[in-house]
């Protein structure tokens, strides 16, 4: 092994030319021909037209449904304002470091979610496969929420919302309009067994839910059409890559903020809103002694920041090499958390109003997840004047929040596949056909969640396939790979070459110690405190249902150890020799900025090397492995 192979830190010009020639199948033609081939390859892969497109695309991906329906609920559940303490701790120690790691890695390598890890450390290429498996699961089930929201939106264009009153064909005798409750009118109904019209609309009209996963039942064709509409919109948002995605996000990433602002203003002007906000923020410091509060804060960071999915790597790979991704990441992380915090005011002001109107404690109306989006909030708007208008705005906001998160996930998966096989998919309309194929396959797989028993399958996907446990597992290996194997100092050199300065040392130590330690602790807590999933805390799945859930969870997590085992098995030599070969970055992974263009001395993982301006190494000290 040569010194140049052991520590590839040069400017990478020759490597870029070689890669461009290889991508296009070229082999000769001299320097001019090679340069032309390289330029053509870069053009074919695409770049963002400007920084705004990148920022809006990332904002659209990370600012999604979880900001509206999960963070406010967790805040009130875990001590109100006191919950912000563990949230900020995880924000600094886990959120920003991993978010920045993935974005910077994509920008430095200009590769998708799999090939970036292959070039940095072949032994840990399984990280890329794990992220794409999680992403594939997400692509199938996340868009189901959009189908539900589209169905609700289609029912908003009436003078009276269909879930506001009883008397429809889907309502039962137990249906009671609580906000207009008159005991003489419901003498035949036991109030303990009564249900609301909004609940019956959700369970009987939308889901037509069966009594268990064992009874899948019929396909809900109306929802199937809504899902088809969602996938059609998603396809045309990304079918031209960054050319189309970069334009669409100007609408999809900004429109939800307009809707959120309108709903916030409306919410805080309602009677009872102040009590709802107080309930949301009132600090209960005693809750900080509960480990579950800290676990909830950590998992919320991972869920809402879209880390460990490969999305940030893919989006960052379309940046210009010298883009200041460090500043972008800090700004986007603050924007994401700020949006979650403000959304809590919009949600809990309305829940406070609903509790005020019904004369019940706010705890009885507070919901999380689909329960908030499709039961609690729709119920609240029925009590407002011009309720169809507010319902329309709310579901439009949900659709746009989910839409850009969905199509960015699909785009990231496509980017990973195309970068693995550039000669195959960067020709003609093959990339567009790949997106079409993935969309069609995901659509038909998703239909099973639109059956009468589909909600039970949806919950399995949500609780296992893309669970916090899977994300934490991937995050541990990402930090180990960059912090220890590739080397945090080396990666800081790469970042300095891109942005012109070195980030705070705190982030480097988070990669090496803090973040993997915290993630490992929460992961173990998950395993120790594991409780089998129950739908609505009532329905218990059969054993084979839990088996399917764990298979989906393991399908991503096992990618990493299996890949390590396979690579070690196939590589020749003793174990130390195998590790040495498999932990060396790709020889053409060069720095392309000012640092890579000038001679200098660099120290990476206790190795000191004299690097010439052409990217070769004139002298190198002992190269140690971290294994």
From Swiss-Prot:
Family the UniProt entry places it in = Belongs to the sodium:neurotransmitter symporter (SNF) (TC 2.A.22) family. SLC6A11 subfamily.
**Protein's recorded name:** Sodium- and chloride-dependent GABA transporter 3
Modified positions (Phosphoserine) in chain numbering: 21
Q: Which ranges does the record list as Extracellular topological domains?
A: 147-220
- Cell membrane in keyword set: yes
Q: Which GO annotations describe the biological process of this protein?
A: neurotransmitter uptake; response to xenobiotic stimulus
Predominantly, its location class is membrane
Q: Where in or outside the cell?
A: Cell membrane
Kindly report every residue range on the membrane side named Cytoplasmic.
Answer: 1-53, 567-627
Pfam families linked:
SNF (PF00209)
UniProt cross-references to InterPro entries, sorted A to Z: Na/ntran_symport, Na/ntran_symport_GABA_GAT3, SNS_sf
Q: Which organism is it from?
A: Mus musculus
What this protein is reported to do is described as: Mediates sodium- and chloride-dependent transport of gamma-aminobutyric acid (GABA). Can also mediate transport of beta-alanine and to a lower extent that of taurine and hypotaurine.
| Gly residues biased stretches | 23-32
Query: Where do transmembrane segments lie in this chain?
Result: 54-74, 82-101, 126-146, 221-239, 248-265, 301-318, 330-351, 384-403, 433-451, 468-488, 509-528, 548-566
Q: Which GO terms describe its cellular component?
A: cell projection; GABA-ergic synapse; postsynaptic membrane; presynaptic membrane; synapse
């Amino acid at each position: 092994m040569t010194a140049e192979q052991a520590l590839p830190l040069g400017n990478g010009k020759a490597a870029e030319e070689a890669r461009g020639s290889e991508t296009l199948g070229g082999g000769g033609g001299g320097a001019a021909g090679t340069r032309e081939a390289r330029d053509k390859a870069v053009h074919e892969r695409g770049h963002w037209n400007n920084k705004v497109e990148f920022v809006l695309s990332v904002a659209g991906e990370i600012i999604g449904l979880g900001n509206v329906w999960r963070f406010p609920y967790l805040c009130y559940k875990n001590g109100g304002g006191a919950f912000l303490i563990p949230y900020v701790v995880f924000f600094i120690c886990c959120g920003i470091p991993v978010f920045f790691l993935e974005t910077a890695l994509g920008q430095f390598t200009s590769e998708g979610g799999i090939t970036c890890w292959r070039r940095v450390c072949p032994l840990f290429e399984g990280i890329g496969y794990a992220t794409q498996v999680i992403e594939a699961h997400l692509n199938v089930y996340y868009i189901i929420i959009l189908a539900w929201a589209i169905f609700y939106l289609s029912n908003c264009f009436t003078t009276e919302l269909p879930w506001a009153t009883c008397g429809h064909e889907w309502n039962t005798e137990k249906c009671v309009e609580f906000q207009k409750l008159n005991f003489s009118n419901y003498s035949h109904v036991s109030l303990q067994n009564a249900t609301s019209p909004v609940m019956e609309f959700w369970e009987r009209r939308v889901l037509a839910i069966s009594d268990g996963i064992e009874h899948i039942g019929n396909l809900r064709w109306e929802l199937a059409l809504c899902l088809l509409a969602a996938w059609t919109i998603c396809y045309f948002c990304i079918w031209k890559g960054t050319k189309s995605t970069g334009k669409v996000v100007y609408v999809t990433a900004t429109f939800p903020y307009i809707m959120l602002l309108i709903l916030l203003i409306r919410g805080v002007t309602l009677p009872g809103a102040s009590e709802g906000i107080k309930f949301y923020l009132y600090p209960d410091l005693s809750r900080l002694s509960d480990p579950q509060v800290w676990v909830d804060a950590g998992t919320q960071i991972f869920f809402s920041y879209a880390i460990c999915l490969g999305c940030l790597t893919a989006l960052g790979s379309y940046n210009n090499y010298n883009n200041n991704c460090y500043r972008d990441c800090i700004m986007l992380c603050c924007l994401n958390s700020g949006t979650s915090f403000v959304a809590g005011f919009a949600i809990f002001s309305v829940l406070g109003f609903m509790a005020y109107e019904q004369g019940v404690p706010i705890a009885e109306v507070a919901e999380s997840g689909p329960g908030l989006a499709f039961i609690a909030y729709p119920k609240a708007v029925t009590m407002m004047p011009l309720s169809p208008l507010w319902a329309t705005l709310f579901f439009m906001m949900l659709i746009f929040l989910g839409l850009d998160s969905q199509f960015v996930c699909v785009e990231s998966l496509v980017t990973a596949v195309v970068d693995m096989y550039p000669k195959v998919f960067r020709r003609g309309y093959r990339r567009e056909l790949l997106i079409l194929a993935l969309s069609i396959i995901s659509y038909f797989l998703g239909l099973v969640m639109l059956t009468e028993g589909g909600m039970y399958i949806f919950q399995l996907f949500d609780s296992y396939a893309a669970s916090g446990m899977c994300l934490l597992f991937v995050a541990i290996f990402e930090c180990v790979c960059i912090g220890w194997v590739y080397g945090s100092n080396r990666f800081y050199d790469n970042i300095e070459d891109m942005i012109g300065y070195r980030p705070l040392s705190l982030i480097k130590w988070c990669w090496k110690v803090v973040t993997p330690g915290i993630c490992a602790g929460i992961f173990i807590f998950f395993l120790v405190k594991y409780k089998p999933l129950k739908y609505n805390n009532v329905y218990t799945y059969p054993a084979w249902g839990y088996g399917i859930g764990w298979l989906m969870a393991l399908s991503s997590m096992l990618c990493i150890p299996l890949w390590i085992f396979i690579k070690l098995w196939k590589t020749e030599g003793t174990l130390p020799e195998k590790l040495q070969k498999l932990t060396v970055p790709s020889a053409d992974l060069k720095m392309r900025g000012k640092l890579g263009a000038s001679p200098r001395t660099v120290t990476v993982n206790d190795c000191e090397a004299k690097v010439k301006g052409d990217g070769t190494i004139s002298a190198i000290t002992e190269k140690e492995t971290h294994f």
